[in-house]
Amino acid sequence: MRHRDIPVLLFLFCCCASAAFAVPPQTSPSFAPATTLTPYLYKVSLVQAAPGKLLDLIDVYKSQAAELKQAGDEAPLWMRHSQGDHWDLLILWPMGSYSEYYQPERAGKRQKAAQAGKLDEKFKELIAWQEDLFAYGPPLADLRKAFAAGAFFHVEMFVALPGMFGELYKEREMENTYAKALKEPENFIFVRNQGAAWDIFTIGVFRDLKHYAESADALPKDQEAAAKAAGFEAPSQIGPYLRRFIREHHDTLAVAIK
């Protein structure tokens, strides 16, 4: 949670890309973002490189992205860990929907591209740990626009307490209302469909670290008014309110990959 204290952080589900993959039912999240009339599906990969192999791994992912684009897939959106959780890379693979992503022709092209580049063998040598999640999120065009303008990211990942998913989603929206009132960037909200345990994760996109920390300059009276308008008792109560609904919460600061 990025609230007014600004604690600036210093600190398998493997998907087979073959035509034989059984396509899961196409369902919409119960708490889809209001701006997402047709929920957009992403495959989200959290990856930790083998020791000393991060730059090599980034190069292989760049090659894979180029090959997949030729096969008809959308280019991924990604970032590199700076401080926080243990993953090195977060990669958002645009899918759209299960049905379109796993169309036999498209899946076949993807498989041929992987085989031609011997990608599976390379990834086995370069990856120490990987976690995959399928999640519904914002329209791809909105995300690309934000990533094109930003180079610094704040990622928050949550596992909700039993029965508290709806309240957690609402809290994420409340924080966006708070941020909007202070003229700060709002978070993109993603909702789990299947895969890793994270129920919700959000990505805040900023120009740089200085932009991320600018909220500390907001006047106390403006913070107070924004918090109450969003439904919080006070700015200092945003964190305690969030903790009512979560079992686990990971924060990460990340930077763009050029």
Residues of each region from the PLM?
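N-terminal secretory signal peptides that target proteins for export/translocation
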Residues: 1-6
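Short S/T/G/P-rich N-terminal loop/turn motif that feeds into the first structured element of a domain
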Residues: 22-258
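Bacterial N-terminal signal peptides
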Residues: 7-20
